[in-house]
């Protein structure tokens, strides 16, 4: 029976990623081949031959000593890193300064250059194998097994080694040779012509390296320097944008890098960062997608497989995990929270499939950032608005990392972590951010928590080693900014001032000449400066607050970092509104309210309602407040307090009492330091206006300690005025409270309130008052008249 023919075995080859991506790894842009670099290469080769010899022949002169090699390498490093092209005349001067001609180094170098200039030799960039092996080949005139070979090698020992395979000089030479070997015959002809012209020219060389017919600046003329420039630009944008290029200029160079150096895929990442700073979200997302698409293949580490298949690239799944996180971050920054959540869900699923702990933790942190804060510049709780998108509470707080061995069960992937130490530092950083997010959630829910020892874990208690990525400083800065913000949130202005000043004082420049030692000008430090201004304004020092704001405007302009600048805009609007309100300048107040509209509806509407009430439109102001849909606990309390104050000013005391009761019921369920005294002070003021003076003094006594410790400048002023008026109307001595009131506004921050204090003093010294004094009364009336001329209008302290 005839056997059936065997079925053919068809081997289906996988996609050739090298061809699809344009042979990126074989088309790297090496060191540009310029006359100065060719001359440096020739000089290096002559120095090696002088030290080692040529082929099997030993050197005529004795080898260089370690001290001599150190001096030689200093000069070679200077020539290799030169940014400008030297003329042949200048190069000759350098060689004469660098080398005494006892070994005829200069003579041999000049002879080689003169041959090229005379057309007697072409440029040949090659080096003997002995440069890499540091071993002489056997003398062909002697038998191969002759013991003389071994004896001569032992006699020379290690002194013939010229350089290390890990040295900068070695890597520079490999880059130059890599670029030269890819040159076409026409390019080789151009190199020879340029070199001949360089040798014969008596003036400074005008030669510029070109790549594909386009001149490239030195910092991006090869893949290595382009990648280094991209990394430095990303670093400076995140730390201090003043030391980076202008964004439009950086975008121009970034696109040149993308076009001319396809292996530098980080150029797309830099473009995405720049587009975020330029507020172009669509272009940023497009660049981020390009970055991860191009990074979906990497260099094959299995050289046996690469040699068999002749393919350098292999696919990687890392972008499937990390790409959604960065894209979601861009969506969050520009307010697209729904898309951000969808992307983060995808990243979490990919991380769970591949058991990547770092990716899983990063996605969790970003998910909580979206759900808790979004991209708001203020500590406001918006959790209820996004509750339908949240499943179960993800656990971002885990066991604290105290040692690198605590990090287990992690499969390292991607370029973000190249060692276990970096894994440990990055996960510790994510854990610290997780703790801070949970603390922010607690603060937004109306709780004051003073345990901060785990907040800045990476920077304080977590051993991060040298902290080369400055993760510890960044986390510590976020923790310090959160501390000072929470203190401002609870009326602890003096403590917040100390915390903010310490934070800013530690952010100093240690070396004026080194940009890497420059102070940080990032968002956490902007928040620290803003909190310093808030703390100054909270105690009535508006001049110092305005000076701080002006300094912040110079340090954080919008064209450098709009994310930091928005804190400055909010701070300036809040403080200037309060300053203009105290001076009865309602027109200026209205312009400041517009600056808050884009950042916080709550802050904007509260101030709009206050202006409407001051203009006598109480009903319209109450409607504005009732139209607010706020879930932030402190925001709801403030709405009730503001509504109650408006009812108090319009003498609708029953409605005011109801609003204050609602505010107090909410405030008593929080642990905020200042909110209960603030509510009770307003209740006391309402009772005073209603004629219930005994009950008013009882409430004032209850909230006295809280107001003195946590009350702002205006809060204390209203408290003292309420106490003074109640004491006077009850026939008691109010001078202690009037003295405190007048001392509080002695610098003229609130002229209308000063008039109110003077009117109380006048009522006290009136003929029918408790302490009649005609002389004192006339003095007070004279002061009142002068103030009225400078600041007309009444004091609307009942609305505050």
Swiss-Prot record:
Keywords noted in UniProt: Cell cycle, Cell division, Coiled coil, Developmental protein, Meiosis, Mitosis, Repeat, TPR repeat, Ubl conjugation pathway
Repeat positions for TPR: 526-559, 637-670
InterPro entries, sorted: Apc5, TPR-like_helical_dom_sf, TPR_rpt
Name assigned to this protein: Protein gfi-3
Entry annotated with the keyword Nuclease: no
SUBUNIT field: The APC/C complex is probably composed of at least 12 subunits: apc-2, apc-10, apc-11, cdc-26, emb-1, emb-27, emb-30, mat-1, mat-2, mat-3, such-1 and gfi-3.
Gene Ontology BP term (one): cell division
The protein's role, per its UniProt record: Probable component of the anaphase promoting complex/cyclosome (APC/C), a cell cycle-regulated E3 ubiquitin ligase that controls progression through mitosis and the G1 phase of the cell cycle. The APC/C complex acts by mediating ubiquitination and subsequent degradation of target proteins. Required for the metaphase to anaphase transition in meiosis.
Disruption of the gene: reported phenotype: RNAi-mediated knockdown results in both viable and inviable embryos, but eventually animals display germline maintenance defects and become sterile. Double RNAi-mediated knockdown and/or mutagenesis with such-1 results in increased embryonic lethality and the production of one-cell arrested embryos.
Gene: gfi-3
Tissue expression remark: Expressed in gut cells and mature sperm stored in the spermatheca.
Any one of the GO CC terms: anaphase-promoting complex
């Amino acid at each position: 029976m005839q056997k059936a023919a065997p079925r053919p075995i068809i081997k289906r080859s996988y996609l050739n990623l090298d061809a699809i991506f344009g042979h990126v790894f074989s088309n790297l842009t090496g060191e540009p081949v310029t006359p100065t670099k060719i001359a440096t290469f020739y000089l290096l080769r002559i120095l090696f031959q002088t030290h080692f010899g040529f082929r099997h022949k030993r050197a005529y002169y004795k080898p260089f000593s370690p001290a001599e090699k150190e001096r030689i390498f200093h000069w070679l490093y200077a020539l290799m890193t030169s940014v400008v092209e030297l003329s042949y005349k200048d190069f000759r001067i350098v060689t004469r300064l660098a080398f005494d001609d006892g070994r005829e180094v200069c003579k041999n170098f000049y002879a080689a250059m003169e041959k090229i200039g005379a057309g007697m030799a072409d440029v040949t960039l090659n080096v003997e194998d002995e440069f890499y092996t540091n071993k002489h080949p056997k003398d062909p005139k002697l038998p191969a097994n002759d013991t003389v070979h071994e004896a001569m090698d032992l006699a020379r020992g290690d002194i013939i080694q010229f350089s290390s395979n890990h040295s900068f000089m070695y890597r520079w030479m490999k880059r130059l040779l890599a670029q030269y070997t890819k040159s076409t015959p026409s390019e080789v002809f151009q190199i020879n012509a340029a070199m001949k012209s360089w040798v014969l020219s008596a003036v400074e060389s005008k030669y510029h390296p070109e790549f594909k017919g386009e001149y490239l600046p030195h910092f991006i003329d090869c893949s290595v320097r382009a990648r280094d420039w991209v990394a430095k630009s990303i670093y400076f944008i995140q730390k201090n944008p003043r030391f980076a290029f202008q964004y439009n200029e950086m975008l121009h160079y970034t696109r040149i890098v993308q076009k001319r150096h396809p292996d530098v895929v980080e150029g797309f990442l830099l473009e995405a960062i720049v587009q975020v700073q330029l507020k172009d979200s669509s272009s940023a997302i497009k660049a981020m997608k390009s970055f991860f698409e191009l990074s979906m293949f990497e260099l094959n580490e299995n050289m046996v497989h690469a040699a068999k298949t002749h393919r350098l690239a292999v696919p990687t799944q890392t972008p499937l995990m990390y790409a959604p996180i960065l894209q979601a971050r861009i969506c969050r920054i520009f307010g697209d929270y729904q898309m951000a959540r969808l992307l983060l869900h995808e990243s979490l699923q990919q991380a769970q499939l591949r058991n990547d702990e770092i990716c899983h933790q990063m996605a969790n942190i970003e998910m909580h950032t979206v759900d808790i804060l979004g991209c708001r510049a203020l500590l406001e709780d918006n959790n209820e608005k996004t509750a339908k998108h949240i499943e179960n509470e993800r656990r971002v707080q885990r066991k604290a990392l105290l040692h690198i061995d605590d990090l287990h069960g992690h499969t390292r992937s991607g370029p973000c972590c190249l060692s276990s130490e970096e894994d440990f530092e990055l996960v510790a950083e994510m854990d610290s951010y997780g703790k801070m997010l949970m603390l922010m959630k607690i603060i937004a829910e109306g709780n004051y928590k003073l345990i901060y020892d785990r907040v800045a874990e990476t920077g304080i208690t977590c051993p991060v080693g040298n902290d080369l990525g400055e993760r510890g400083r960044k986390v510590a800065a976020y923790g310090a900014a959160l501390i000072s913000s929470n203190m401002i949130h609870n009326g602890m202005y003096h403590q917040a001032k100390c915390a903010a000043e310490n934070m800013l004082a530690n952010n100093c420049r240690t070396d004026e000449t080194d940009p890497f030692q420059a102070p940080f000008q990032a968002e956490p430090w902007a928040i620290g400066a803003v909190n310093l201004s808030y703390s100054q304004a909270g105690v009535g020092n508006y001049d110092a607050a305005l000076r701080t704001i002006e300094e912040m405007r110079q340090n954080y302009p919008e064209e450098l970092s709009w994310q930091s600048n928005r804190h400055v805009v909010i701070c300036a609007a809040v403080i200037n509104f309060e300053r203009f309100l105290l001076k009865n300048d309602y027109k200026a107040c209205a312009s400041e309210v517009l600056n808050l509209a884009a950042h916080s509806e709550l802050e904007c509407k509260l101030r709009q309602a206050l202006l409407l009430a001051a203009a006598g439109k109480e009903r319209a102001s109450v409607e504005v407040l009732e139209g607010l849909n706020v879930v932030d606990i402190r925001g709801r309390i403030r709405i009730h307090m503001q509504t109650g104050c408006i009812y108090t000013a319009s003498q609708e005391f029953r409605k005011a009492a109801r609003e204050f009761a609602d505010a107090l019921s909410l405030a008593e369920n929080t642990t905020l330091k200042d909110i209960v005294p603030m509510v009770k002070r307003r209740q006391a003021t309402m009772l005073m206006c209603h004629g219930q003076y005994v009950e008013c003094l009882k409430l004032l006594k209850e909230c006295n300690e809280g107001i003195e410790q946590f009350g702002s400048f205006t809060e204390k002023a209203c408290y003292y005025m309420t106490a003074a008026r109640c004491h006077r109307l009850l026939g008691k001595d109010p001078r202690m409270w009037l003295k405190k009131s007048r001392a509080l506004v002695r610098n003229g921050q609130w002229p209308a309130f000063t008039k109110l204090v003077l009117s109380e003093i006048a009522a006290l010294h009136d003929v029918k008052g408790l302490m009649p004094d005609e002389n004192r009364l006339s003095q007070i009336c004279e002061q009142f008249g002068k103030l009225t001329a400078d600041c007309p209008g009444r004091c609307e302290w009942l609305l505050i």
